[in-house]
């Protein structure tokens, strides 16, 4: 029987680090638990199986018509602008695919990020005396860098003493440099918040920089949090609402 609800295809980058795929699958399980009526599939761009083209071929063979392809990315940079559209263009013509927006920025992501900081030992009362490093993966895309800077400003407005962006690759400054910079301003403590979804090489680089520079608090990655799962479903709903009526009836 034809299901008018589009399949949600979560597209992750993939990694040689097994923690990455484990986190992605844990997140998609949480999404399924929040919206049991929606079919959720996972595909990877590289390193992990199944690859996105394999998932799309299987869906087409099963008679699926409509797919919302959701990049599991916090920022709109190269993968969202180039890699993923190129892969989706190779899909079978019978599939009607809409690429959803990336996850960030979104208020729920900041909620998840602050919750990770509190889980790491901070409390809301510490905000006014804590310098915060917003550590992201990094990008050569100016738009992506500007978004991270804007998120840092938004966090500053929620009460943190100071918030500075840092990047694990492709852009400067690095995490250790920003930890030392904040320390030099005389804040009581310095905390590092990885603005990344899953463990892997770049988050490990963030952790190494934080520890090398003597950060007082290092939060965990966002991971398969309830907030992240809710943002995924919000992006799915936005894309579904934008589809032609015949695809959403």
What do these predicted ranges mean?
Residues 1-249:
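Active-site-proximal alpha-helix that buttresses catalytic centers in soluble enzyme cores
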